[in-house]
Amino acid sequence: MHRLLLVSCFLLLNSWAWALKPTREWIATPDSLGLRYQTTALSTPDHAQLAGWIVEPAATVPDRHTTVVVAYGDANNMSHFLSQARALSQGGYRVYLFDYRGFGHSSDFAIDRQRLYYPEFSTDLRTVLADARHRYPRSRTGIIGFSMGTIMGSEVAATSKCDFLVAEGYVASPQLLVAAIFQRSQKVVTLPAEAAEYALVARRVRCPWLLVGGTADKSMPLADSVAVARAARWRQRRQVLCFEGGHLEGFYRLTEAEYGDKYVREVTRFLAGKRS
């Protein structure tokens, strides 16, 4: 099953929708990878119902007492990120996966498949982050966002209590992204009105922030992540982790003995205050 999920991850890396493309059916559950987990069912302030999984740290490694909430991208559902969750679990992390409204087994939500994202997804992430903090008050709790999920991740980190943010394939400008999509493929992708304020978000992120990017990522250039890190002001700790590869290939490229093991070690180094 783990091999099948790795194949799914590889296909996912090469099939980004660049607009919303949710799927309802889970391709696996955590127990199929031998992961210890529990299910969650949350209600957001605006009454959406969210399905989630909390994957516990592997029993064979020291517990880092750190909870990582996963904000994935624009396609599929949380089951497609079980391989990343497994790698983090094997590194001693608790991993909180969830489905946005309209994705997976969460409640229905009318989605325009030409839309890049909805602000309601930030409400979903904020709800899950708050639940994680409530369940594990003595745990360090933060967010790892991928692609579109970096929009929600940075917005929530800027406005909520968040101990750290990891952003791979960081979206620096939704407006430039949709313009690039149109230039490349003549595909029209729309933005919510709230996107007009997104340029102000990065400067408000106060927690430690690790930006992960590929040298060959043409969609979210590594230079954008470098610029955000260099713009850090006093007491804003930001660092860039780069790898040789394309969009969202970080776990795949930063692998030595096991899938994503080097990636997880670099996250651990960052959270410990060490530089790569």
Regions found by a protein language model. Name each.
Residues 84, 207, 221-231:
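Short alpha-helix in the alpha/beta-hydrolase fold that links the catalytic acid
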